[in-house]
């Protein structure tokens, strides 16, 4: 790829960032489509995020992806949020139209699309959702919009717990889905809801390098063959949770599915063109 002065810049702002596959995936897609953009990753944490957004405007970047820990903070620095992004309270995509910033969240649509592509119908189903960060709430919001009956959200009593309660209230007021929030320390409640759940989704970073030997499921007997277990983490590809799920006879969806589908939507938002899906799956080695 020969980058010229006509190329526009798209970024990814997160910390840490060097593990991300998004730059490789998006640049392969852009090159295949013959589009004059290049995608670069920038290590940006909460403290440096405001300055990074000013830089985005000053450099007239086309936009940026947003990942941990900036997804919720980023909502404060855009001019407009989509209805779904408002429901989530977090964004992973910013599009810059001549200095006017629009915030989107493709994490939720990407993850739910990966579930649907596997042949699983979420309508009327119950999801146990682990975590209340940007990715987790995006998945919950999109699932609620697309027909989940119940979401049982579990989170530790940390700085995200109050945000989880606020998220549940927004979803309960704006959709037909019923969301409840429980402390993850309540393992009895966790076991009880898993027994009758249809989907278990890990929306936390537990299982991601360097936490690859950890899982929020402490007892593999809680998993049952009728349960679909889905993962947001893709580094490593096979997390401990997915290993547990496969041992228990569960159907699983790895983090590549969400990465692929959320990235495809981002690509179209930034470029206005279709994402070369099959090509990217092939060159990136994604089975999703």
UniProtKB/Swiss-Prot annotation:
Look up the record and give one Gene Ontology term from the biological process aspect.
chorismate biosynthetic process
Which of this chain's residues are annotated to bind substrate?
A: 71, 107
So, what pathway does this thing act in?
A: Metabolic intermediate biosynthesis; chorismate biosynthesis; chorismate from D-erythrose 4-phosphate and phosphoenolpyruvate: step 4/7
Keywords, alphabetical: Amino-acid biosynthesis, Aromatic amino acid biosynthesis, NAD, NADP, Oxidoreductase
* Recorded GO MF terms: quinate 3-dehydrogenase (NAD+) activity; quinate 3-dehydrogenase (NADP+) activity; shikimate 3-dehydrogenase (NAD+) activity; shikimate 3-dehydrogenase (NADP+) activity
- Say yes or no: keyword Lipoprotein present: no
The record ties this protein, via Pfam families, to: SDH_C, Shikimate_dh_N
The reactions it catalyses are: L-quinate + NAD(+) = 3-dehydroquinate + NADH + H(+); L-quinate + NADP(+) = 3-dehydroquinate + NADPH + H(+); shikimate + NADP(+) = 3-dehydroshikimate + NADPH + H(+); shikimate + NAD(+) = 3-dehydroshikimate + NADH + H(+)
Positions of NAD(+) binding: 132-135, 155-158, 205, 232-235, 255
EC id: 1.1.1.282
| Entry's family note | Belongs to the shikimate dehydrogenase family.
What NCBIfam families does the entry give?
A: PRK12749.1
Function noted in UniProt: The actual biological function of YdiB remains unclear, nor is it known whether 3-dehydroshikimate or quinate represents the natural substrate. Catalyzes the reversible NAD-dependent reduction of both 3-dehydroshikimate (DHSA) and 3-dehydroquinate to yield shikimate (SA) and quinate, respectively. It can use both NAD or NADP for catalysis, however it has higher catalytic efficiency with NAD.
Quaternary structure, per UniProt, is: Homodimer.
From the Swiss-Prot or TrEMBL record, give the protein name.
Quinate/shikimate dehydrogenase
